[in-house]
Structure formats: structure tokens, C-alpha cells
Amino acid sequence: AYRKAAAENPALERIFVQERDQANVQMTLNAKNYLLAAEPKGNLYGALYSVLATDDPNQRKSMHYIGSCIGRAAYLLDKAESFSRDKDKGRYNVFLLNGINDRNAARENARRQALAAVNDLVRAYGMLDVKLNRTLLDNIMILGLRHAIEPLDAESQPVQWLSLIHISEP
């Protein structure tokens, strides 16, 4: 799939290589800033999502921002999940560099930051001019992200997802 996408859109391949190299620099420098550490994945997702937009520059900008928010959340959640392995093997992990020494604390930190990214995403998503399948997209973008971010334990504070956006009637 990667080769096909790269053949169809060489600019995406250049962005992928550039952001991979930037991620390696962040790891080499032991970046402690969460936003800076997540930026390469956010940029990559932003580029991928902007390709899905119409030719309208505002729609393209919104889709880029949506992708960057998803990339930022994905990076942080991934680093929280790999926390124990990274700690055991002495690998780079932004949570370890910030003095977090417990996997559950890393997961909660990632969850809070991912929720902030999703709040940003929801604002950009609300500005999209979706003509078809709005209800389907609402389910994917809102409920799907909720499932990915909100932990399944009963002690967590539930998020009022429907208050984050105004879901339009068909």
C-alpha cells in the first residue's frame, strides 16, 4: 500500500522521509516537549489527510489540521503503550524523559493530551463542508476517536462527547 501511495503521490513520500528523519532527530536529542516529540507524526498524518480534501484551500487546511491532531494523539497513545518496553530496553520515550516512571501515569497523561488534541480536531471538523454521509463521518470521527482514547476502566471520568460538537440533523 505504501509503494502504491508513494507512486501516486511522490510528495507524500518526500514528507514521509522528512518526518521520519525529524522523528529520529527528536529521539537523538531526547526531546522532552510533548508537542515537539509528536510533531513528525502529526505532520505526516496532516499531509495524508489534506490529500483527502477537496480543492478548496479552507477544506484542505481543515483536513490537514484534523490529520495532525490524529497524528499527535496516535503518537502519544503509542508511546504510552510502549512505555514499559521502552523503559526496560532504555529506549527513547517522551514520558520517561518527563519523569514519569509508571505505565499507568503515562497512559493517563497520554489520554489527557489526546483528548486535548481531539477537542482541537472537533473544532476543525465542525468547519468542514461535508455534503455526503455526514452521519457516517460523525460516527467515525467522533465515536471512533472516543473509543480509541477513552479507557475502558470504570474509574475514568467520562467525557461529554456530544457537547464537543453540534451533530446536525439530516
Feature roles, as predicted:
Residues 5-17, 21-40, 61-64, 86-127:
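Divalent-cation-assisted or electrostatically stabilized phosphate/pyrophosphate-binding catalytic cores
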Residues 49, 74-77, 125:
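A structural signal for well-ordered alpha-helices, especially hydrophobic packing surfaces
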Residues 51-60, 128, 132:
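Inter-helical turn/loop segments and adjacent helix faces that build the functional surface
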Residues 59-60, 134, 138-161:
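Histidine/acidic-rich helix-loop-helix segments that form or flank divalent-metal centers
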Residues 61-85:
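Active-site alpha-helical segments that house and flank conserved acidic catalytic motifs
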Residues 162-170:
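Residue-level detector of conserved catalytic or cofactor/ligand-binding positions
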